[in-house]
Amino acid sequence: MDLYSTPAAALDRFVARRLQPRKEFVEKARRALGALAAALRERGGRLGAAAPRVLKTVKGGSSGRGTALKGGCDSELVIFLDCFKSYVDQRARRAEILSEMRASLESWWQNPVPGLRLTFPEQSVPGALQFRLTSVDLEDWMDVSLVPAFNVLGQAGSGVKPKPQVYSTLLNSGCQGGEHAACFTELRRNFVNIRPAKLKNLILLVKHWYHQVCLQGLWKETLPPVYALELLTIFAWEQGCKKDAFSLAEGLRTVLGLIQQHQHLCVFWTVNYGFEDPAVGQFLQRQLKRPRPVILDPADPTWDLGNGAAWHWDLLAQEAASCYDHPCFLRGMGDPVQSWKGPGLPRAGCSGLGHPIQLDPNQKTPENSKSLNAVYPRAGSKPPSCPAPGPTGAASIVPSVPGMALDLSQIPTKELDRFIQDHLKPSPQFQEQVKKAIDIILRCLHENCVHKASRVSKGGSFGRGTDLRDGCDVELIIFLNCFTDYKDQGPRRAEILDEMRAQLESWWQDQVPSLSLQFPEQNVPEALQFQLVSTALKSWTDVSLLPAFDAVGQLSSGTKPNPQVYSRLLTSGCQEGEHKACFAELRRNFMNIRPVKLKNLILLVKHWYRQVAAQNKGKGPAPASLPPAYALELLTIFAWEQGCRQDCFNMAQGFRTVLGLVQQHQQLCVYWTVNYSTEDPAMRMHLLGQLRKPRPLVLDPADPTWNVGHGSWELLAQEAAALGMQACFLSRDGTSVQPWDVMPALLYQTPAGDLDKFISEFLQPNRQFLAQVNKAVDTICSFLKENCFRNSPIKVIKVVKGGSSAKGTALRGRSDADLVVFLSCFSQFTEQGNKRAEIISEIRAQLEACQQERQFEVKFEVSKWENPRVLSFSLTSQTMLDQSVDFDVLPAFDALGQLVSGSRPSSQVYVDLIHSYSNAGEYSTCFTELQRDFIISRPTKLKSLIRLVKHWYQQCTKISKGRGSLPPQHGLELLTVYAWEQGGKDSQFNMAEGFRTVLELVTQYRQLCIYWTINYNAKDKTVGDFLKQQLQKPRPIILDPADPTGNLGHNARWDLLAKEAAACTSALCCMGRNGIPIQPWPVKAAV
């Protein structure tokens, strides 16, 4: 996370440069919303007929509160109408008014605001009309909700408290929590807007942290709303600071501390409502008895933003607990930043909050008010104890029993970060002693040895920062002037090591009083081995002293070695990894640039590795025959790079991913080109030779001759599978923590000739699972057709499966599909949106009945996310938990009727579509059968190429996350079909050539103009005129062969995709065995 790597003193600059929105975009969006509000007032919010009058408009959301982040933000435009005389009126007329407002909005946008684009996403909030304003460069956007509302407050003056009747009426309306929050937007906005600018900067910092946590792959829907963190930030500032100028690092530290204490939080304000009115007072008492955390909206007491029963605050708390070692929480001298002190704020070493209540200054204090008894701990309960802080300032989660290994399998998922801090990180005191001892040893050798060193490098886990408590390893590489080549090291090594040992034995006499130096049996010919032992701290370190040839020389940070270094190594005739000591510095630098939390994950993996070795000593392979622990370090870095790349992440997810890769050891192919690469011909041939060797292959990033993957992985794989079902991988709701999406080999590192094997091994779904899914879908479709709308004139005409699963291009793992339900109640395209909530409700009920009444070979789950406009379910393998298909259920108008396979639809279908549509591809679900048939009829090998392209595309989405929307994946499928058709239509083509052709077309996106006429053409005048219009639009153009309104090339970041495509063309996957680039087919970018 970029925030974590920012020094505490630089956070103000970080907020100003990285988080505050661009003024130009803010001003354009403000003008646009102002003009829209004026237009709605003029038109009364309706077109034609007698229109309700707009009483006032209020801008809310983060944009209205002044807490909008750069990039993407939200805004609420609340339209108060005179036709609403009560809260209840809003429900009755909302749909009608929203429909008319959309018409007004579309009419108003006929004259667009320069520099902005307006788009309508899928409408997922029943009480609002949602649209997005995007800058033309696609760097900034604002999600706007247009909300019609009851003007309960009237023209309230600033700072004036609403009448209690406002809230008693709200409570009597029978509303859900926060249902009418829009009515109080003005109060909510004013509550934040009076705050100092720096407090709003702190809010931006907290929100940025929250969004980074969301990017880790956690389900954003399960986390509390970000507005809850805005309120928590204000609470922290009020209780601990209340100054206009303060340290952002201290403020952030305080807010994260509160998040850790979420189970004790009870926060509310009485600036707008209070206990004076009996009805409101009784309601507040009930609210304050809710599960913690409780964070009441200061404008609407029915809205509990904390909602401890619903949101996963523990996920945020877990991340908060693990981030205090980062530079943003360290002062210039390395001292930790302290949090603010105050009532209701966490205290060092305490597990609770002293005073978790926030009151208005004019409100009676708890001591003087009988109304507040409900917020105190229940009778008989004791306040949280406050133990004396230990060395880390926190109580240990697992009692330390001398001589007993901690059972990792029983550590709860959310406690893994603390487990690492308390039990795996080495003692700072012992580390200091070792550093002191090493300095003394090096001084001794420098002053007394005959053979002089040019320089020294510290390696091993100690040098890399991955050393465990209770024992680590250090490599001291002594680069000697007498070695001028790799071959010089062998003949003189024994003599030099004997001299070094003699010097150490004679010179070491209690040089570090707390440490003893011991020489074990010497079993590594190229090194002098000894131990530094601290009896008092019960810790030791194994030290290896290695004289070596300085092959690399003094390199500045980030500089690649001269290719000649490695060409000399390859021609030296060395054994595998024989000269790895010469590259210790590169190895250390490769690891040291990694974030703190990744190193913590490495510690966890190594601790597990040690436990496996210790528990199975004498039962199976000896620990020496296991792969080296360093192989697990590299595998952990590989997992993080490919699956996460965030400074903060879920520790259990990372751990599970590494264990998953261990289980796939027979397919592991892992290497890096940070120090050596395929640009040098000799190195390219060497790497290609390495890639032809049996798996696992885990090449050292510093020494390409050293495959650290050698060893017996079977025992590790068995133990990894056994650990997968233990407590350390179970989330709070009892479900298994899901690993990151990481494969044991990378596309870019796969030779072109091995692409077919890559697809079959890693991309093709399991055939048994696909058969089970198809059988389950057939059962579900039949059930829905027979049982939906039994006592209704509505009939299910047919149910059609769409998406990649239906087309035969699904990828292994988690894929998406559509189940389109064609209904008789829709007689034209524009009716599809009618009765959607009612129809979805009926289909949901029947899906749940099907789930209960039918037997399935796969796990069938209907989504619990009860959005009245969206319905989804998933089918998951019972035996392979990473294999699943997520289905969206989509009601649709049967525009095509019973179409005979291979026949063309009537041109009238497309004439009606052209006259009906408002947004591109709006009714594409009606053409699902045609979309499916267009792909499913293609040769098997072309579908394999489509899988390869989709896999490449998904890797690109990880890289470009947060930088704008890439073109839709379906567009890449069509581009692949086009490349094959224009490239010769050979059913047994060269996979690398096909892939290379698609990449070439992506780089030529500015010229792309692709369409088909198998379903529609220009013979009908209306359709022909429309096609001409479509084809005259800016490139790229990729028209959906089933739906001519759908241009899959429009309004997306093709430039990002093109950049990745250009990079891929020089990778091994696009290069022949002789190092010559694969050539694309001769395909033009336009039809």
UniProtKB/Swiss-Prot annotation:
It holds the Pfam family OAS1_C. Keywords: Acetylation, Antiviral defense, ATP-binding, Cytoplasm, Immunity, Innate immunity, Magnesium, Metal-binding, Nucleotide-binding, Nucleotidyltransferase, Nucleus, Phosphoprotein, Repeat, RNA-binding, Transferase. Residues 12-57, 186-200 are annotated as: Interaction with dsRNA. Present at high level in placenta trophoblast. The keyword Manganese does not apply. InterPro entries: 2-5-oligoAdlate_synth_1_dom2/C, 2-5OAS_C_CS, 2-5OAS_N_CS, NT_2-5OAS_ClassI-CCAase, NT_sf, Polymerase_NTP_transf_dom. It is an enzyme of class 2 (transferase). Mg(2+) binds at D816, D818, D888. GO terms for biological process: antiviral innate immune response; cellular response to exogenous dsRNA; defense response to bacterium; defense response to virus; interleukin-27-mediated signaling pathway; MDA-5 signaling pathway; negative regulation of chemokine (C-C motif) ligand 5 production; negative regulation of chemokine (C-X-C motif) ligand 2 production. The modification Phosphothreonine is found at T365. The modification N-acetylmethionine is found at M1. Belongs to the 2-5A synthase family. OAS domain 3 is catalytically active. OAS domain 1 has no catalytic activity but is essential for recognition of long dsRNAs. Interferon-induced, dsRNA-activated antiviral enzyme which plays a critical role in cellular innate antiviral response. In addition, it may also play a role in other cellular processes such as apoptosis, cell growth, differentiation and gene regulation. Synthesizes preferentially dimers of 2'-5'-oligoadenylates (2-5A) from ATP which then bind to the inactive monomeric form of ribonuclease L (RNase L) leading to its dimerization and subsequent activation. This is 2'-5'-oligoadenylate synthase 3. The lineage of its organism: Eukaryota, Metazoa, Chordata, Craniata, Vertebrata. The gene is OAS3.
